[in-house]
Amino acid sequence: MKRLLYIIIGVTLLLTSCDKEDSTNGHLDGFWQMSSSPGITWAFQGHILELRDVKKVHQDIVMSFTREGDKLKLSDPYRVDRDSDDVALKDADMLIPYGISNTSTEFRISELTSSRMVLDNNTTHLEFRKF
């Protein structure tokens, strides 16, 4: 009887300790390669966007994002510094290589599939492939 009680408690703990992270981002989550500049990648997870230059020409950036329907809002960019604290960006100079012209900006999601994403705003047209 005591053994059965331990088994029930153990199974209960296992089932309650496992939690799956749910994301409402759909196809947006994952790694995207910019078509016009193959060394530039955008990576979406949760509410964080990581901008990375795989060729290491430009500084890596992290930003917050929200998605509301076909709108993608980007804000709060930080320059990634692995050796000390990340640094908040005051201007958009470091964002320009990633196709972003302001520290807070909004794109319209023109197309989003499991393999392709197209973003537009008044000044920029960005195309990505998922990998």
Give the label of every model feature segment.
Residues K20:
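Short, conserved catalytic or interaction motifs in soluble domains
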Residues R116-F131:
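Edge beta-strand at a domain terminus
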Residues K2-I8:
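Sec-dependent signal peptide recognition
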